[in-house]
Structure formats: C-alpha cells, structure tokens
Amino acid sequence: MNSIQLIIDIILILWLLILTVLYLRKKSLNLNIVKNKKIVRAKRYIVFYVIAESKVKGDDLERVVRNSLKDLLGNVWLNIANPKVVTYKEDTQEGIISTNRIGYKAVLASLPFAKEINGNKILIVPRRTTGSLKKAKKLIGLK
C-alpha cells in the first residue's frame, strides 16, 4: 500500500514539473512578441446623420461633439478618443466622425448628449461604425 502511494506521488510530481516547464516556456515566448503598432493606431469611423430644426454647419457640429464627450466623461477621454468630423454634407446632414479604436464607444455614448447648436435643437444619430474611411464615404454617398 505504501509503495503504491509512493509511485502515485512520483507520477504527480513529474506531471506538475512537466506542466510548469511548458508554462514557463510559453510565457517566455510571449514576452518576445513585438506588439503590432497598426492595432494601436487603428481608426474607427462613425457614420451619422443629424436631425435638426435648421441646417447645421460642420465646424459647429465638431465643437458640440467634443463638448458632449467632455461633459460626459471628462478631458481624459476627450484626449483619448480625439473625435473629429472628417466629412459633413450639409445638404443631407450626414457625416463621418473619426476616432480611434479605444475611444469610439465613448464617442457613441456621448452623441445623445449633443442637444443644441446655436440655439437650434439637434439630435445626432449614429448609423454605422466602420474601420475604413472608404466604406464610410460609400455609406453616405461620396465616391
């Protein structure tokens, strides 16, 4: 009985030793992987349209989007997301907001808080989020 227990203990110790070696090898391999810089700089484009009482200008729209993000989450998230209105068609009141991969959800969350431009009530409605500017322009009818 005692010898059977000794054999089981030795097998368990060997098994744990093998698992430990495999784990440490895998961990050392992961440390040598260089992070992909393209992922860090990946952009997201939010296609939106504006419902307003009268026509809205693109410059005013960018200011309101940035202020709504600042009011909702503060200066830190404003600097992280850095939203910019890339394209805005005043006739159809459609446009594209450019942001990064980290902050696009913060920008989406702050859009309903943009309620007024120069005394004019507005509502910014996001239609779609894409990863390429070409597809975003195609969605609003450019090129």
Swiss-Prot record:
Disulfide bonds: none annotated. Its main location: cytoplasm. GO terms for molecular function: ribonuclease P activity. It catalyses: Endonucleolytic cleavage of RNA, removing 5'-extranucleotides from tRNA precursor. Its EC number is 3.1.26.5. Belongs to the eukaryotic/archaeal RNase P protein component 2 family. Consists of a catalytic RNA component and at least 4-5 protein subunits. This is Ribonuclease P protein component 2. It comes from Saccharolobus islandicus (strain M.16.4 / Kamchatka #3) (Sulfolobus islandicus).
